[in-house]
Structures are given as structure tokens and as C-alpha cells.
Amino acid sequence: MNHIDVTQRINELRTLIRRYDYHYYVLDDPIVSDAEYDALMNELRALEAAHPELITPDSPTQRVSGTPASQFAKVQHPQPMLSLGNAFTTTDLLAWRDRVLRLLGQDTAVAYVVEPKIDGLAVALTYHDGQFVQGATRGDGEVGEDVTANLRTISSIPLLLHPPDGGHDRDVPTALPSLIEVRGEVYMRTADFEALNDRLAAAGEKIFANPRNAAAGSLRQKDPAITAARPLRFFAYGVGPVEGVELTGQWQTLRYLRMLGFPVNQDVRRFTDFDEVLAYCEQWMARRDELTYEADGMVIKIDDFAQQRELGVVGRDPRWAIAFKFPPREAITRLLNITVNVGRTGVVTPNAELEPVQIGGVIVRNASLHNADYIAQRDIRIGDYVIVKRAGDVIPYVVGPVVARRDGSERPWQFPTHCPACGSPLEREPGEAAWRCNNFGICPAQLVRRLEHFASRAALDIVGLGERQAELFVQRGLVRDVADLFYLKAEDFAGLEGFGPKRIANLLNAIDAARQRPLDRLIVGLGIRYVGSVAAQALVNSLGSLDAIMNARQEELEQIPGIGPVVAASIVDFFAHPENRQLIEKLRAAGVQMNAGPQRERKSDVLAGQTFVLTGTLPSLTREQASALIIAHGGKVTDSVSKKTNYVVAGVNAGSKLAKAQQLGIPVLDEAALLALIGER
């Protein structure tokens, strides 16, 4: 073929492949076999290889390109990618509907667009004159990460927009936008996730816990070739900035996106009657297992963009949209055995060993049984079929037995009378549910957990010291308390499995750096009962040194904001034990920081008089950083939610504090909303 013929054939092949991609990914209606498709793609690759001057960035062959990135660049979103407020019951949804109508006017006609809430990773795709130029993760809603090269590898994301023809939708624009930011979710279908995990397991690699983690981990690979090998998909659900066309509503926007070549959820619906909205949500709550992907709820949006603008945004949550969350998933499986774990404070916790069962995309083999009373009250027996729930779709726990399925082979379980690690008698304080091993100084299980806690990110942050290393150190007798870490030498690691010269040097450097951590982090690391990051910061801010804290009287401690009688008594009791004071002196002799550093600069009084409670894991700030930020702007941070709490800042895996805040009607912020509140974005 001459050059003109080659150019013409390449263009024909690209047009055909894009058409077949559109039918496969958008219309879900393949019109050629895989073999025919592969033959066309191979022909295109061969022609482009022979004529590299004809390769263009939007060619279907150019999805995987570039070299592995060392890190992802930050991307400022031109418009914030907002989070959604949550509704957990139909009562919550009706309350949201009533607020909308109160703001718009009771007689205002309102339409709602409803679709399943895919549990994936939110991204924004930018197109200039129809060509894909940049893709970014949501990040904190204001700033995300540039993952353009990886997003290009996802076949369901068009590199070149499909010219819209309008079809039967006369209200849908027929022009290509000069600029459009398309927002949606990168996800992995359940079947693809399971197949990926099977391949990883067969190769001896670490498997993913659930499809969302798999999607997020695959998209954030530094090498686009790895992302390309993962079965990622994309659903579009909205837009950011748009230029060159006018979009007036959510329903119209979704149809327009579909015409441009984006997959849009087939289960999206538009309703004008809110009773139909409720029925549709309840229908999918009952049928969620029929979905080919993991969904944790339904998203309801006001259709009309003018009404959306009128309703506006509160914090980081739009008033014009809400997420109806499905209840925690549960399953029935057999309880094989009950074991106990000894924590760093000596609390002995029962753990259920289960026949593996899938709950919400995760294989569950172990679950919490809380305490001895919980087991006794529910008459949970070894061999029982039990109901297992994942609280917040994260933490599995046993709800109770299915008594009707008992066959007489089940065995009652007795809580141990002695510590399984050191043999000391277990004790229980009056009014408490927990049994404890009080052999604080000798119990090896407690020491392992204390070492883990001492080295954790919230405490001294000793990178390279985790559960496995702590167990090795205790088994070999290298440490008898946390202070011994600072006396370790390179020769102590001789013959220790997994410790080569480089790893030893890195760990010793991390331990050395831990000597200069802020005093509040050391206090957290000591593991004083009831004293977390917030209380530790309050102690340091008020008293300034570990000596002052050690020697403070209970009534003096109770005067510190955020330190109540129970916490104060626990602090006094901890330092009343001679072995704990000896530990402090040993740490002091090792050069560990015992005094507060320079006072944190007060940045503003914007949060003066406001009380905050933190719960869950925030996207970029640690709990300590968030607390310090609030305090620096005049706010106060406490550990418990009450009517006096002004805001609860909630992250991933938020627990009972979030539930109590919602019960009391206390405003809930995410990290981005907190930063917006204090003017730090």
C-alpha cells in the first residue's frame, strides 16, 4: 500500500474499533466476535509499527504508553468534587425531601434521578475539543492525583469523544463540547475481582480485600502497564466544568455522556413522585446481590441544575443530593472455634474462627465476639451456625446463633480462667465486662502488643517495627519493655530471620529518630488507659513536661479541658506503679524527648468556642494532625460526643461516635469540610 492507502486504512481501523468499543462498553451490545476485534487491533498495531509517523495519541493502540512514574502530581480540581450526605432509613430520605421542598417551595415541581452507588474510586476526566487530556482522582475533593496515564489504559474510557447525534432525545445537545470534565467511578466487577484474586493467589502475591481496594490499588500503580492488566471499568455519573454546550439537568447530562461514548449505569432512573424513589431504593436494597459490581447504596439527585444551584452546598455536602446507604451485609456460617487474644493492656478478647464466608465482597474467616458476657448472653456455642455482620461494611462480628439449625453436636464454650500467654489468673473489675491479665510486666503477649502500639503511627511512628518484628524481639529476649528498643545494637540482630544489614540499619535509624518525637506522641505510646491523642495533647499543652504530668494530683488533672475524673484517675494510677516510673527513667536515659517543644503558633480564632470530636480515618491528615490544626485555630478537641459537641469530623470506618452525632443532630464534617471551615484548602 502507498502512504495514502495506509493512512486511509489506519483511519478506517480506528473508526471501526471505536465503534465496536462503543457498542461493547456503552451499549453493552457487542456486534463482532472477540476474534474479529483482535484481528482488527492487530492489523492496526502492525500498520502503526511500520509507519510510526502516523501514530496519534488518541489511537486505540496508545492506551498503554509512557514509563513508570516515581510519584503522582497533584491536580487542583476546577470545581470541588463534593461528598454526599448519608441517609440510612426511609425516614432520613423523607426528611431530606422535606428540606428540599422547604427551600424550593412546597408547590415546586421536582424530579429526581436515582442510581446505584458504585463502591469504587471517584475520578475526573478532562477533554479538550473531544480529546482526553487529563485524569485525576478525587483526593480530598479539592486536590487529587494525576493518573492520566493509568486512566488511558481503561478501555471503557474513550480517548476521543464520540460525536453525539441526538437520536430521539431532542433536548440533548448535538455538538461536541470544547471543554468538558466528566466525573465518574472506576470500579471492578465482582467476577473480575474474584478472577484477579485467583491469579494473584496462584502467583503467590497478596490478594485484595474487596473490589474497591482492588480498583484503587490498580489505578494508583506507578506503572501503567500493571494498570492495563487489571480488569478496571468506568461509569460516568456527572460533569464538572463544561464549555461549548449547555446542559440543564442531570438526566439530560447522563444521556449526553452516553452519546459521547461514556458508559452510564443502565439502572439509572428518573422519577417525579418521591414514593417511586423510595420504592426504587428499597427494590435495589433487596436485589443488591444481582448487581455485577459492589454497591453500598443509592444516589438520589435533584434533576434540574437551576434547582441544584438554588439549593447550594452545606460544608462539603450538596443539599441537592443524598446517598441512601444499604444496611450492613450479613451472612450465616459455622462457628468452628473460639480463641482469645491478649491486648496491650491485658484485656483478653474472644475471637470467632469461622468457616470462610463472603460478606460484602470480603472473605470473612474471623469475627469479634466482644467479651465473655456477650457470648453467655447469646448462648453462642462452638459448632453453631451463626449470623455474621460487617459493621459499617468493615468490621465483622457475630450477631448470634441460629438456634433452629442446632443438631446437638454444638458445645458450650468456657472463658479461660488463666492467661493463655503467661498463665496468670484472669481478673475482672466490678462493673466491667472485660477480663484482664494483670501480669503487666511479664506477659509476653502484652509486651508484643505494647511494642506494636509504641511503634505505631499515632505514637512514636517507628517504621519497620510491626507485629512480626515485635514477636521476634520478644521471643529472642531482645526487649523486656518498650525502652529496650532504644538500647538495641546491630549485633543484637545476628541470626534473626529477615534482618539483613540494610534492614537493620533502617530500623535502628527509625528508632533513633523516634527519640525526638513530640511529647504527646510519647504519652500515647506509653499506653495509659483512656489516654489517646486528644488527651495527650491536652496534657502537654497544660503541663508542658512528662515530669509535671507524672507528679500532678488527680484534682489538678481534672482541671485540664478534656480530662475528666476517669482519665485523671487512670493517669495517676499509671504513674503510681514503680515499674512505670522506672520505665520513664529508662527512656530518659536513652535520650527520649521528655519536654514539650515550642508552643504551637495560634493561627487564628476562627474555631474559638467550638468543640470537635474526631472519628475514623481521614484521607490525608492523621488524627494528631487534625487535632493540632483545630487547636491552632482556637478550637477544642474531645474524645466523646455530647450535646456540647459542635462538630464531628468523620473519616473512613467511623464508628459509634458518628452514629451518636447523627442521633443528636450534630453537624458531621469530612476532612475537606474541616479544611474549608478554617480556610486551609
Swiss-Prot record:
Binding sites annotated in the UniProt record for Zn(2+): 419, 422, 437, 443
Catalytic activity: NAD(+) + (deoxyribonucleotide)n-3'-hydroxyl + 5'-phospho-(deoxyribonucleotide)m = (deoxyribonucleotide)n+m + AMP + beta-nicotinamide D-nucleotide
Cofactors demanded by this protein: Mg(2+); Mn(2+)
BP terms from Gene Ontology: DNA repair; DNA replication
One Pfam family cited in the UniProt record for this chain: DNA_ligase_OB
Active site: 117 (n6-amp-lysine intermediate)
Spans traversing the lipid bilayer: none
Role of this protein: DNA ligase that catalyzes the formation of phosphodiester linkages between 5'-phosphoryl and 3'-hydroxyl groups in double-stranded DNA using NAD as a coenzyme and as the energy source for the reaction. It is essential for DNA replication and repair of damaged DNA.
Keywords on record: DNA damage, DNA repair, DNA replication, Ligase, Magnesium, Manganese, Metal-binding, NAD, Zinc
Name the UniProt record assigns to this protein: DNA ligase
Sequence similarity: Belongs to the NAD-dependent DNA ligase family. LigA subfamily.
Binding locations of NAD(+): 34-38, 83-84, 115, 138, 185, 301, 325
Origin species: Chloroflexus aggregans (strain MD-66 / DSM 9485)
Gene Ontology cellular component list: cytosol
Enzyme Commission no: 6.5.1.2
GO terms of molecular function: DNA binding; DNA ligase (NAD+) activity; metal ion binding
Domain BRCT intervals: 602-681
CDD domains in UniProt: LIGANc
Class of enzymatic activity (EC top level): ligase
